[in-house]
């Protein structure tokens, strides 16, 4: 919600005071299940390129993963970091039930190594707090770099790893309010 979506949502809510938008934080698999049960009108998550049949996913904006590390980390002096340079680093990440954990495994394995996960925590803010304490590093969407995290620096990876944000919905069930929201988010 910190990226480009925040100002768009702010404007949409101001211009459409009669539209009630409820936010429910859930992992992508839970959002998809709720969409299938018609408990949600739309879901928003990263890299939603293969939703369930019958659902549409539209990219809201392009984003990339960055490496977040303690400000005194030796790699912090670099402008960009190759993924392979993280081979011997300890990672702080979300738990294995979260898509970020699976993502981290896949990305690191594509660079020829398995990540050494030292801590798993529930919230991205806690991940970044642990990074600031020097416990480890993490890969995180670039929208987090828009906020100040004392003791943490964000560096791009030499390889672009997409963290694009998508909205997923059923076009056949889209209400006029949802269509208006999607138009605002996509434009």
Task: Tell me what each language-model feature is.
Residues 27-40, 45-46, 97-152:
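Hydrophobic hinge/microswitch elements
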